[in-house]
Amino acid sequence: VEIAKEEIIFRRNKNVCFLLNTNGTLIDDDMMNFFVQEKFTVTVSIDGPQKVNDANRVFLNGRGSFRRIAENIEKLKKGGVDFNLRATISPKNTRLLETFLFFESMEVPYSYAFTIDSDVKDRSTTHFDANGIKTIDKQLGEVMNFFTRKFMGKENIYCNDFQRNINRLRTKSVRYQVCAAGRSSLIVDEAGEYYPCQNMLSYQDMSVGNVSEGIDNSRLQLFRSKEVSQLASCRQCWAKYLCGGSCEAERHLLGQESKDWKQKCKMIRLEWKHLIHSYIKLNDFINNMSNKHKIIDYEKFERAGA
């Protein structure tokens, strides 16, 4: 924080936003005061209700971390910290709708992502095979229908991804890159190493520099998010300007011609298929004469996608 203030805010007269990703197990009062003082936005990783979360997130003694995380989420709420939640959905999660019901009940903004395949992790915990994708297809339909019903009932929706993506369909916005990795954001780890995004943190060979020596621009160009129009594997895909080219970390880990990469692309298309179905239902609902008096606040989608 002090380095960023000195080098970027004071010397270069630029604004900086501080973001912190945490597993949510070590948050205390001093940290919360620091977050508020420095205007941090904190993302807490939690994968769902206790049974789901504790299947993956455990302490060294094997005890699940859910209760500790839940306690600290309440602390963040009471402390006035700007924070959100992030769920990682693994093949072990066979009750997707229950997971999203849990997050909506928390009444905290959240996002989700599917596990990233990696040869350094147990594939049973990260890889969705053909049967897993078939199951996810059905369950994603249930989840999107749930959000659609909430929206029609003018209930609050806390899932940032659903709101943002429906708004993108409504405004016909085009996604030229998948994310801001290495473009307008960098991640720094506890050793002072820079990475384009959090998904690369575990992989030293994806480092693009460090606090002491600065940024290696050639490596930054290699690992930052790419323009989807430059990606040969995306050129014939109908969802390329919705997806933006998918995760750059996975592209390097899997290889964009691999079977695993193609499976990942299939999952992304399934997700957008269900989002498009939800968008069509919402438009039909708005245009139905019997529902004309029910004004749906699209502005909240714009705020969520900002």
Go through each PLM region and give its residues.
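Flexible loop/turn segments at secondary-structure boundaries
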Residues: 23-28, 51-52, 92-94, 119-121, ...
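Active-site and channel-lining beta-strand-loop segments
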Residues: 184-199
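Generic recognition of stable, solvent-exposed alpha-helical segments in well-folded globular domains
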Residues: 30, 68-71, 94, 98, ...
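Canonical radical SAM enzyme core domain
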Residues: 1-42, 46-52, 60-68, 87-98, ...
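Radical SAM enzyme [4Fe-4S]-AdoMet core and its adjacent flexible, acidic
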Residues: 55-181, 185, 204
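C-terminal accessory region of radical SAM enzymes
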Residues: 134-168, 198-244
